């Protein structure tokens, strides 16, 4: 009987302390959304596959070209 009473008291104590900690932790996790959107221009020029092929062929490269991270590369 004595052990059951001690277990009941300890469970009640743990329940109360966990509820108190839960209320404190939810207040600190409120995140507010920023209203400003930041857009950055990519450092390298964009490349569209069909435009790259067409530009290279119009310059005289009969095999066209391909897109790389640095832009369009024409094939001989």
From Swiss-Prot:
Protein name: Gallerimycin
Keywords for this protein: Antimicrobial, Defensin, Signal
Induction info: Induced by lipopolysaccharides (LSP). Induced by A.niger alpha-1,3-glucan.
Taxonomic lineage of the native organism: Eukaryota, Metazoa, Ecdysozoa, Arthropoda, Hexapoda
The organism's place on the tree of life at top rank: Eukaryota
Membrane-crossing segments per the record: none
Function field: Has antifungal activity against the entomopathogenic fungus M.nisopliae, but does not display any antifungal activity against S.cerevisiae nor any antimicrobial activity against M.luteus, B.subtilis, and E.coli.
UniProt family annotation: Belongs to the invertebrate defensin family.
Region forming the signal peptide: 1-19
Any Gene Ontology biological process: defense response
Entry keyword Protease: no
Organism annotation: Galleria mellonella
